[in-house]
Curated annotation (Swiss-Prot):
Family (UniProt): Belongs to the UPF0664 family.
Upper taxonomic lineage: Eukaryota, Fungi, Dikarya, Ascomycota, Taphrinomycotina
Protein name, UniProt field: UPF0664 stress-induced protein C29B12.11c
A Gene Ontology molecular function term of the record: transcription coactivator activity
Keyword Cell membrane recorded: no
Length: 174
């Protein structure tokens, strides 16, 4: 079963097919994932080992453990909210956040997602994630720029009294 299905390159079950204008940032092996839907739906999915790939458009998880509840999962970057790095006193560091559902996806409502980096690499992931989020924010802020009022139309002065000093000299030189 796939959650928000992932398309693979032909003949491979770990090499994801990138979307148009999508590029791979980094991949992290040995990552555990748990997805817990918020009430009213109490669906949940877990996997203890898999490959996590971060692209410029989405987060993709491919399960490598045969005992997992699902085969793969993906979420658009914009659908992951309230993300944070967690460093428990005991256990591996993990990254958590809220994933918003996509139309016709496998997640029925908002869900808590937890990515546990059992084989290291979380700080590289956090650095790549923060760069990606910063780019999203820059693009968003550019699209919301307040434009100034248009400049008034230019009208040629009607008399020499309305012209700035030395205007005639400058016009005659050119």
């Amino acid at each position: 079963m796939s959650i928000n299905w992932v398309t693979y390159k032909e003949g491979s079950e770990s090499d994801i097919l990138l979307l148009e204008n999508e590029c791979m940032f980094d991949c992290f092996d040995g990552v555990a994932i748990s997805i817990l839907c918020k009430p009213p739906s109490l669906k949940s999915w877990t996997c203890t080992k898999g490959l996590l790939c971060l692209t410029n458009q989405r987060l993709v998880y491919i399960a490598k453990d045969t005992d997992c509840d699902f085969k793969d999962f993906q979420s658009p970057v914009a659908n992951l909210k309230d993300t944070k790095l967690n460093q428990p006193f005991f256990g591996a560091n993990y990254y958590s956040g809220t994933v918003m559902p996509v139309p016709n996806g496998g997640i029925p409502c908002e869900a808590e997602v937890k990515l546990q980096f059992n084989e290291g690499g979380i700080f590289n992931f956090v650095e790549a994630w923060n760069r990606l989020i910063q780019r999203f924010q820059e693009v968003d802020s550019v699209s919301r720029v307040q434009h100034l009022d248009p400049l008034p139309p230019y009208h040629r002065p009607s008399s020499s009294q309305d012209q700035p000093p030395h205007y005639e000299e400058a016009v005659n030189k050119s």
